[in-house]
Amino acid sequence: MPKRILQGTVTSDANAQTVTVLVERRFTHPVLKKTIRKSKKYRAHDEKNAFKVGDTVRIIECAPKSKTKRWEVLEA
């Protein structure tokens, strides 16, 4: 099964080797026919602490790195 790749914005870089990434998805409501925005935060592994708040990054699924980290930063 291929690994998912998502794109989002870094919202926190306070922890060592970890960034919080806000990923937004858009879809059309089936009844209202209105575009709806939903967002979700993912904690991703950042080996070199290279990314700062506001950076747009791509994250990829990986084996669990910790209790909450299942993603790692692929590129900016």
Curated annotation (Swiss-Prot):
Top-level division of the source organism's lineage: Bacteria
Pfam families linked: Ribosomal_S17
Gene Ontology cellular-component annotations: cytosolic small ribosomal subunit
SUPFAM superfamilies recorded: Nucleic acid-binding proteins
Keywords for the protein's UniProt record, in alphabetical order: Ribonucleoprotein, Ribosomal protein, RNA-binding, rRNA-binding
One GO term of the biological process aspect: translation
GO molecular function: rRNA binding; structural constituent of ribosome
Subunit structure: Part of the 30S ribosomal subunit.
Family, per entry: Belongs to the universal ribosomal protein uS17 family.
Entries under PANTHER family matching the protein: 40S RIBOSOMAL PROTEIN S11 FAMILY MEMBER (PTHR10744), SMALL RIBOSOMAL SUBUNIT PROTEIN US17M (PTHR10744:SF1)
Designated name of the protein: Small ribosomal subunit protein uS17
The organism's taxonomic lineage, starting at the top: Bacteria, Pseudomonadati, Pseudomonadota, Alphaproteobacteria, Rhodobacterales
